[in-house]
């Protein structure tokens, strides 16, 4: 299985993902149906499934059009939304077998209450939607958002094998690292990656594994990294530090 990534260059800086082999394809969180349709047709693939991490519009807007073109594709999601009902409802710990590959469902609320991630263990790929970003985490602005649930979800993801690569739904590399450097301006990892991505177009930015992400993500580091106590000594590591950082990032 291969992962195809597109950057949409829209105001939300969305990434779009498609998994495929020589015969089949799986779409993740389609915003723009046309790019998927073009690739599927060019490579003579069969669209087997559409996986939805959560119900925000920039993750589901392309579903209806894809289903018009590929009516046999099955939609997997945690809950209903305003545009469609999924064919298959998923829950935490579910194992989904597509025949040519499979994934495990991880319930990861916090950004919104219906959020799930899809872990393809064989491919070492985690499609994490808006829960985890490179160097950051999802916002907590939705009505059903909960920063404590987001913390628990990030802890869950951070406990996965370090060689698994997270594929987030947005490119927020620079802004997240700028925020991290506002807290720890001399941090080696933050400075290294900020320099690495500064001149790269979004479509060329790296896909790092969780072992690397744990070094460059201040929110993952807030779980246990004592260096944060130097910058924010009045907060305890773990949930308290994470919540404080999320509040600071809201106003950054």
From Swiss-Prot:
**Reaction equation(s) it catalyzes:** an S-(2-hydroxyacyl)glutathione + H2O = a 2-hydroxy carboxylate + glutathione + H(+)
> Looking at the keywords, is Secreted present?
no
Question: EC number(s) of the enzyme?
Answer: 3.1.2.6
Give the record's pathway.
Secondary metabolite metabolism; methylglyoxal degradation; (R)-lactate from methylglyoxal: step 2/2
Tree of life domain? Bacteria
Entry keyword Transmembrane = no
SUPFAM superfamilies linked to this entry = Metallo-hydrolase/oxidoreductase (SSF56281)
InterPro entries attached here?
Clx_II_MBL, Glyoxalase_II_hydrolase, HAGH_C, Hydroxyacylglutathione_Hdrlase, Metallo-B-lactamas, RibonucZ/Hydroxyglut_hydro
Single GO MF descriptor:
metal ion binding
Query: What CDD domains does UniProt report for this protein, alphabetically?
Result: hydroxyacylglutathione_hydrolase_MBL-fold
Cofactor note as given: Binds 2 Zn(2+) ions per subunit.
Pfam families associated with the record:
HAGH_C, Lactamase_B
Q: Which UniProt keywords apply?
A: Hydrolase, Metal-binding, Zinc
Tell me which Gene Ontology terms the entry assigns under biological process.
methylglyoxal catabolic process to D-lactate via S-lactoyl-glutathione
Q: Which residues make up the binding site for Zn(2+) 1?
A: 54, 56, 111, 130
**What broad class of enzyme is this?**
hydrolase
What this protein needs as a cofactor is: Zn(2+)
Functional description taken from the UniProt entry: Thiolesterase that catalyzes the hydrolysis of S-D-lactoyl-glutathione to form glutathione and D-lactic acid.
**Family under the similarity heading:** Belongs to the metallo-beta-lactamase superfamily. Glyoxalase II family.
Q: Which PANTHER family match?
A: HYDROXYACYLGLUTATHIONE HYDROLASE, HYDROXYACYLGLUTATHIONE HYDROLASE GLOB
Quaternary context: Monomer.
Entry protein name: Hydroxyacylglutathione hydrolase
According to its UniProt entry, this protein's organism is: Francisella philomiragia subsp. philomiragia (strain ATCC 25017 / CCUG 19701 / FSC 153 / O#319-036)
What high-level taxonomic lineage is stated for the organism? Bacteria, Pseudomonadati, Pseudomonadota, Gammaproteobacteria, Thiotrichales
As recorded in Swiss-Prot or TrEMBL, the protein's gene is named gloB
